[in-house]
Amino acid sequence: MIDLAAERLAAEAGAEIVRRGRSEFCERAVVDSREAGRGDLFIGLAGEHLDGGRFASDAMSAGAWGVLVDPDHGADLAGEGAGEAWVLSSPDPERSLQALGRA
């Protein structure tokens, strides 16, 4: 379990809260949307061939606690879904993941 409340998690990650979710704590972080489920924070990393942020909506549909994506994807996701998932935005999701690893 990630032992950080949502606002502290965002602060540690250097991320902005774009939309608040329902649950205060997430259980784990994942970078593969196919593995995302209830309680997970999906982090959309940009790769050589794919931008993981494109799959954040899939993670939310799978019940993810929230998503951490770049600002463009964050703006797109702000109004998506029923409002259960947190949407966090960071200019560099990879750096945010590293910061969470140190927190």
For each of these PLM feature ranges, what is it?
Residues 2-103:
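Short, basic phosphate-binding NTP loop
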